[in-house]
């Protein structure tokens, strides 16, 4: 079973993430940031990842530390659940539409952190959620999961739709990349023999 639990405690946040990469999309989310919970739900449902996230942060200041640290902890949990990366497909991509919005996400479990984030948001906030925090979430994830991640919103007018398509596509790309390939069982998906 590819299950992991990670706890991260700092002076700014206390976070627990538990996940099962071979789940059915069940989720239990309580980050204290409602829009983040909504986006994490998209990852769980579209990635078929069972996901529990509990976070307590200094949201009286703003949501930055909580959102970033949830991304960090999720990245650590994914890396822990995958282990040595033997037998995974390694690459995943997805295009997801939502009404007028369309996003593409491509992921590579390369062991080399890298983020290309190109989302021309049409407004700065979705409700009370600062859209810039989505970059911090994905940067935290990338740096601690050891992945290269390309995120492109190809079109969109509604900022909520833009970001929701990003998170849905991320969940689907993640699902594809961590899927076990029977033909490559026990093999590292790299000509170098390591990731």
UniProtKB/Swiss-Prot annotation:
Pathway entry: Amino-acid biosynthesis; L-histidine biosynthesis; L-histidine from 5-phospho-alpha-D-ribose 1-diphosphate: step 6/9
Coiled-coil regions, chain positions: none
Localisation: Cytoplasm
GO CC annotations, alphabetized: cytoplasm
The reaction(s) this protein catalyses: D-erythro-1-(imidazol-4-yl)glycerol 3-phosphate = 3-(imidazol-4-yl)-2-oxopropyl phosphate + H2O
Keyword check for Amino-acid biosynthesis: yes
GO molecular function, one term: imidazoleglycerol-phosphate dehydratase activity
UniProt name for this protein: Imidazoleglycerol-phosphate dehydratase
Organism: Burkholderia orbicola (strain MC0-3)
């Amino acid at each position: 079973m590819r299950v992991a639990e990670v706890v991260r405690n700092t002076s700014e946040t206390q976070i627990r993430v538990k996940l099962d990469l071979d789940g059915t999309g069940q989720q239990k989310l309580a980050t204290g940031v409602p829009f983040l919970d909504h986006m994490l739900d998209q990852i769980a449902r579209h990635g078929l990842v069972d996901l529990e996230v509990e976070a307590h942060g200094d949201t009286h200041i703003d949501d930055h530390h909580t959102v970033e640290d949830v991304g960090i902890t999720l990245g650590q949990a994914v890396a822990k659940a995958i282990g040595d990366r033997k037998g995974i497909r390694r690459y995943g991509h997805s295009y997801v539409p939502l009404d007028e919005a369309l996003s593409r996400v491509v992921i590579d479990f390369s062991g080399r952190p890298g983020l290309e984030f190109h989302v021309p948001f049409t407004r700065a906030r979705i409700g009370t959620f600062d859209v810039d925090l989505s970059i911090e979430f994905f940067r935290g994830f990338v740096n601690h999961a050891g992945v290269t991640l390309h995120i492109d919103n190809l079109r969109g007018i509604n900022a909520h739709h833009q970001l929701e398509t990003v998170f849905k596509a991320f969940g689907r790309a993640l699902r594809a990349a961590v899927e076990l390939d029977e033909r490559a069982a026990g093999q590292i998906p790299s000509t170098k023999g390591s990731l």
